[in-house]
């Protein structure tokens, strides 16, 4: 069972945000650049696996989580581990998944003290434990791309390059049919080179189209996730509608309020997405 830590006061023992990030990255072999990126909950799940082997089913952890309902799923896994090990700590899930600095910094400060009180110094291979999966930081286009590129300059991390690997391989394959890259740089521009530049541009546009499709699919799942919750609330309200409660009436009024051009998803579509989510779990 775990040793509980109840102190939440700020003391000289608390690490700065930079030191805290360094500890997280060094311990789990990550490349987080902001405290806010802990909002996915994946890092905490693996820390629990490090402290108490077997208390977390890492296969259930969504290491590539990018949407809020996926963060919530990870924190549910963490809550189950807390309960299993007798950790008396209420996880402020609703605050953490919003990705605000202060909420996440306060929680990681507590968790660091909890970790120090329970860690026995045994060896742990985080990459092996998560089967080589990379813990993807929550989407932040400006910082994420820049920091990822900077990391690749000095560190060879195969899984970091996987999202763009196929695109680069295809482009390299096309260019190699003409001449090595060094020769292409020496030759003056020509119509032949222009054709390959057009091919590279087409590949880039296709990749952008794929990225947009994945984004839309994720947003649709998130929409249906919250819509299903509203349907559950609607059913509860309908069961008690005969009580003439002003609270129930107010909730129903909010549920049925619409704006021009709004169209709720069809029931079949919601059930299909819900089945896909269950299959992922």
From Swiss-Prot:
Keyword Cell division among UniProt keywords: yes
Cited Pfam families: CH, EB1
Region feature APC-binding, mapped onto this chain: 217-260
Localization per record: Cytoplasm, Cytoskeleton
Residues of the signal peptide: none
Region (DCTN1-binding): 217-281
Compositionally biased tracts (Basic and acidic residues): 272-281
GO CC, alphabetical: cytoplasm; cytoplasmic microtubule; microtubule; microtubule cytoskeleton; microtubule organizing center; microtubule plus-end; midbody; mitotic spindle astral microtubule end
Family listed: Belongs to the MAPRE family.
Free-text comment on this protein's domains from its UniProt entry: Composed of two functionally independent domains. The N-terminal domain forms a hydrophobic cleft involved in microtubule binding and the C-terminal is involved in the formation of mutually exclusive complexes with APC and DCTN1.
Name of protein: Microtubule-associated protein RP/EB family member 3
Source organism (scientific name): Rattus norvegicus
The encoding gene: Mapre3
């Amino acid at each position: 069972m775990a040793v509980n830590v109840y102190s939440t006061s700020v003391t000289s023992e608390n690490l700065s945000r930079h030191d805290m990030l360094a500890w997280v990255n060094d311990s789990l072999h990550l490349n987080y650049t902001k405290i806010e990126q802990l909002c996915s909950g994946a890092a905490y799940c693996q820390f629990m696996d490090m402290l108490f082997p077997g208390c977390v089913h890492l296969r259930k952890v969504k290491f590539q989580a990018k949407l809020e309902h996926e963060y919530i799923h990870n924190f549910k896994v963490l809550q189950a581990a807390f309960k299993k090990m007798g950790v008396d700590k209420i996880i402020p899930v609703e605050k953490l998944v919003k990705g605000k600095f202060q909420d996440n910094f306060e929680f990681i400060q507590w968790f660091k003290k909890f970790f120090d009180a329970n860690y026995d110094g045994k060896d742990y291979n985080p990459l092996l434990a998560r089967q080589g999966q990379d813990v993807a930081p929550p989407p932040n286009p400006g910082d994420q791309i820049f920091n990822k590129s900077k990391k690749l300059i000095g560190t060879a991390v195969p899984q970091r390059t996987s999202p763009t690997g196929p695109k680069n391989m295809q482009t390299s394959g096309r260019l190699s049919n003409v001449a090595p890259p060094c020769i292409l740089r020496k030759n003056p521009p020509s119509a032949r080179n222009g054709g390959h530049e057009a091919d590279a541009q087409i590949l880039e546009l296709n990749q952008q189209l794929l990225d947009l499709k994945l984004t839309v699919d994720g947003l649709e799942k998130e929409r249906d996730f919250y819509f299903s919750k509203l349907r559950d609330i609607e059913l509860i309200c309908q069961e008690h509608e005969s009580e003439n409660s002003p609270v129930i009436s107010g909730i129903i009024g909010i549920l049925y309020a619409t704006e021009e051009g709004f169209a709720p998803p069809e029931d079949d579509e919601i059930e299909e997405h819900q089945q896909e989510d269950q299959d992922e779990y």
